[in-house]
Amino acid sequence: MDALEDYVWPRATSELILLPVTGLECVGDRLLAGEGPDVLVYSLDFGGHLRMIKRVQNLLGHYLIHGFRVRPEPNGDLDLEAMVAVFGSKGLRVVKISWGQGHFWELWRSGLWNMSDWIWDARWLEGNIALALGHNSVVLYDPVVGCILQEVPCTDRCTLSSACLIGDAWKELTIVAGAVSNQLLVWYPATALADNKPVAPDRRISGHVGIIFSMSYLESKGLLATASEDRSVRIWKVGDLRVPGGRVQNIGHCFGHSARVWQVKLLENYLISAGEDCVCLVWSHEGEILQAFRGHQGRGIRAIAAHERQAWVITGGDDSGIRLWHLVGRGYRGLGVSALCFKSRSRPGTLKAVTLAGSWRLLAVTDTGALYLYDVEVKCWEQLLEDKHFQSYCLLEAAPGPEGFGLCAMANGEGRVKVVPINTPTAAVDQTLFPGKVHSLSWALRGYEELLLLASGPGGVVACLEISAAPSGKAIFVKERCRYLLPPSKQRWHTCSAFLPPGDFLVCGDRRGSVLLFPSRPGLLKDPGVGGKARAGAGAPVVGSGSSGGGNAFTGLGPVSTLPSLHGKQGVTSVTCHGGYVYTTGRDGAYYQLFVRDGQLQPVLRQKSCRGMNWLAGLRIVPDGSMVILGFHANEFVVWNPRSHEKLHIVNCGGGHRSWAFSDTEAAMAFAYLKDGDVMLYRALGGCTRPHVILREGLHGREITCVKRVGTITLGPEYGVPSFMQPDDLEPGSEGPDLTDIVITCSEDTTVCVLALPTTTGSAHALTAVCNHISSVRAVAVWGIGTPGGPQDPQPGLTAHVVSAGGRAEMHCFSIMVTPDPSTPSRLACHVMHLSSHRLDEYWDRQRNRHRMVKVDPETRYMSLAVCELDQPGLGPLVAAACSDGAVRLFLLQDSGRILQLLAETFHHKRCVLKVHSFTHEAPNQRRRLLLCSAATDGSLAFWDLTTMLDHDSTVLEPPVDPGLPYRLGTPSLTLQAHSCGINSLHTLPTREGHHLVASGSEDGSLHVFVLAVEMLQLEEAVGEAGLVPQLRVLEEYSVPCAHAAHVTGLKILSPSIMVSASIDQRLTFWRLGHGEPTFMNSTVFHVPDVADMDCWPVSPEFGHRCALGGQGLEVYNWYD
């Protein structure tokens, strides 16, 4: 036999799929979910954990699962065994399964039957299956024999957009077909006079003005619900559809979705709808919206299911997420908004301010200087005191804590501050702090040990008052501890404050958007053991001029650290310290994560809130350790969970330009505000939590544009990763080592996600998401991979620097550190620090004469990135970017990525550059040379010698004086016409002979492979190594014109003898190299549509290679050499 026949071909097997969830069905206490051709089985038993118990791979071949139909059992018991028909596209398969005692067994599986048309619906009929096909016909199928028993078409052979089969026997079978003419056609297949004889429709139902995507029939009440492209849901009174000639009445026309409605489901008491706007609505049968579930991202919710006994709704989205929600009557309910009826003849004056002391006591002050208390339990108002000094202008703030520590503070326009014990208001303490107006008040609490009140006066002076209580608890003591002085600004007062644990510093935010760090007491910085290395002179008394007109001068402690204008001109709204970090929010629509090192504030990460919520008002840490964001979205107050992307509470309050207060405990949440001269109160039980379950986290809401593997972490036995598979369910050879691959993905949804992919569980865990980009992210590059602690003290984990770029010519650099953490589901935690950013038009925004200049095209996109690591000590790497405006740009990273500057550029290609790739050439007795390859939409390749360019002009490594005029990159060392159209994939690999193997894939489906030689020539006018100039020459060149049927978007040379390519034709193909033209070895069909990128890497000798494919989803393959 020929030696090639004995070669073991690489056979790639799918180990993980993250695709849109297109099918859901509750069977007893189990949930079946369809994801591509795979079936996920979840246990919904309340006695155990809500978890996945099995993934059945490739059940439907190359078809996507769209639905499940369970055969009814005579005894109605589906808790032990079930016969399930799985269908999607043109495929159908029947499976008998057993799932008792938390295990899953597949008892029997039929063959995969391919229908001649699209399957819209399936229904069991006495052991057979009826199928509604795409051109308005019905097929009766025998699942045991695998043959068609009968096929009946309709006289209207139109294309259908949905269908619903009704009935339990062939004689009474009814089909409701949604035609592209926006009509519902009701007809009866059993009335056919002969086989294949068309049947005329019995009824035509009109009403929708768009295509009907889904329908649901409730037999007990004779109702039919339809969902349409016209963004509406209609409810029809149809009676018993199994009886011909019935009357149809439209009893409900429901508008609530802002986009197309994909799915609808009728329950006994509810109607569930879900659509393209990623919202699942719960309606009454009268058309009233009862609940709205928001949390999925992207292009919509594709599948819904309901568990009526447990009152659950399950949704599956385009983001690959699966969520479980509680219907009305289960879990926590909002108590709604109620007016507290303040207006009364016994309570004169107009309300000026309101605050909350805990979740059940409310304080309000009027323009007469009267302070009132409202007890939510007693539901009555009580006047605590009245002080004429606090007429007209009055600030009111309650002390933090579960019930406000029983204290509140008032301030007026004459510099007076009053601290009031709520239970004994006669023991209030007055102090005059300033000769002018008090601009703001805030409390700072350190556990139960220390309570401070900060008051801002004229000239940026902040008085710090120490509050303590007498042993009897009936009196309080107010003592001024020190004074701080804010940096100069137009509106010079603080807005919020918090203790930085362990309590040596105070973190404050001011009206100009700055975050400041102050010592919590005078003389603190004299102690060398506190605060680390503070700046010289920081915290020392400084002098500021007052604004009272008397020429008085105030002295105060200056900040030891300042982050000026961090949140823009609208100011900082809150400061929270948790887990060693400082979190700040502002009215710029962002929240920052900061930390203090050596007495200095340092930004870690900037995150955006949900779209449209530009006024962030606060941040809370909930009992499970996650955070929720408070803010205003137009005229609504919103409590938003950034992890689940869900709006937990929405209150239509009229906006944030009013007095309002928020308080939350584990038992309840309260939001009070002034509107129409009265106090309005919204309360919800359960605090800032929502009793819903995320069965599986979503990944990205839009297409994945780039996949990049960072490295591998080995977890010891103490960090064992839990597996949802039983040991006897694992596939042979899948028992790999306890390795976890860290992969970075970026997407058109403007986020960069860090994933953990264990080799043993076939699962994916999203560790964190970075949301700094303002447009789609197209490319990611990684450099500086290491371990925590560095080479001297290596620790378990992984560190790396990441550069991401995309639309609006925007680039960001950040570092990640992945460390073991047994408290998380993935047993890993990821810490992200944002280092720097760059936009091409930043310099233009700072130009005073910009009206005379031509602005850089704001639509420029970065298409690809490549990191070029220099061999010169002390210099950071270069980042090469392929740009849509025809340029190849080089950026210089300095100070470990904290400085990112444009260095050089070239417009050689004169058209959109799609790919850049860097590689090095190393030869004996010669210095290492850095080369760059770029590819454009005309199919040309250009090779640049970066080492020669840097040697000839040493000033190139210094950033240009004018950021708008970078250096020129020069002319390429070699140009090559490799393809007839755009090049979407590019890779190189050094050979043993000292050459380079270069491969490229094009939009025309072709591959181009050639061997590149780098020869060093001596210049006549130069001597030594500096006079050596590389000459690039092609030694061998081969092409495969029809390697794929569509764009080749992924390419990797695994070794000098094997190459793998991926294309939009959904084929992963292996090629043999080294024997002339690349020859076909093997091909595997993958399930990710519109694949945009691919990355392959070796894992271990036991596990072989892994390959990640990203597009409209993510799929991971592995194969053995």
UniProtKB/Swiss-Prot annotation:
Compartmental location: Cytoplasm
GO CC terms of this entry: cytoplasm; cytosol; plasma membrane
Keyword Acetylation in record: yes
Sites bearing N-acetylmethionine, chain numbering: 1
Statement: the UniProt record of this protein carries the keyword Cell wall biogenesis/degradation: no
A biological process from GO: wobble position ribose methylation
Its biological purpose: Together with methyltransferase FTSJ1, methylates the 2'-O-ribose of nucleotides at position 34 of the tRNA anticodon loop of substrate tRNAs. Required for the correct positioning of the substrate tRNA for methylation. Required to suppress amino acid starvation-induced autophagy. Enhances the STK11/LKB1-induced cell growth suppression activity.
Quaternary structure and partners: Interacts with FTSJ1; the interaction is direct, and required for 2'-O-methylation of position 34 in substrate tRNAs. Interacts with IRS4. Interacts with STK11/LKB1.
Family listed: Belongs to the WD repeat WDR6 family.
Name of the featured protein: tRNA (34-2'-O)-methyltransferase regulator WDR6
Organism listed in the record: Homo sapiens
Organism placement in taxonomy: Eukaryota, Metazoa, Chordata, Craniata, Vertebrata
